[in-house]
Amino acid sequence: WHAMEHNNSYGYLTDCQEVPITFPPQHQERQPGFEYVMEPKPVSECGKACRKLEGRTALITGGDSGIGRAVAYDFVKQGADVAIAYYDEDRDAEETAKRVQQLGGRCLLLRGDLKDTAFATYCVDKTLACFGKLDILVNNHAMQFIRRSILDISNEQLAFIFQNNVFSFFYLIKAALPHMKRGSCIINTTSVTAYQGNKDLIDYSATKGAIVALTRSLALSLVEKGIRVNAVAPGPIWTPARSP
């Protein structure tokens, strides 16, 4: 981020700039990828804890690796219990759960396909059964496939990427919302591609733009219920998602 100019009402205005980042070559034949095969290993630990989330329960999708894993570790250090929904990356998920336990937290692993509405409901139901409450929903999972032209994006891929990256967010929110009380929050992971675009990730960028619109609209819808809805838009991060 680059500080632009001082504003009396809002402090320093900022503008997102492209920063050259070079990642080591990486290719995995499947999505979602596996974090345990990455070299170097991503850094998932965070700084000091001040127990801001004591007594809270969070459901984090894609929490087996990457950004989701880092969020899980941070939340546990802040005092939360975590439920982690993931696809089939068992080794990564078990490593995350083991570290959560080492940090003194409790972790529930939920394996399945979030494109399935029944699994979204299952995740919420199991979280409630295990921890008795749901305070934080982190919709973090996503897939991306590099395509050099929009003509290379098949109709099947287009439907798949929207079902996985957008529709599943709706399924989880609809399943979780009846159980979330005032003071709860929903956090959606979008991307800088929603604002800047990406010529090789056209369909992925479109899903991230949809998540921005979902977040803003849902925030307006739930403000009177006292439920916050926010989005985080990361730039390039060294995760298994960067391996198609």
Predicted regions mapped to residue ranges:
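Conserved mid-core segment of classical short-chain dehydrogenase/reductases
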Residues: 18, 22-23, 116, 121, ...
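Active-site loop immediately N-terminal to the catalytic Tyr-X3-Lys motif
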Residues: 151, 183, 196-202, 224-225
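Alpha-helical segment proximal to the catalytic Tyr-Lys
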Residues: 178-179, 220-224
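Short, flexible catalytic-loop segment of classical short-chain dehydrogenase/reductase
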Residues: 233-244
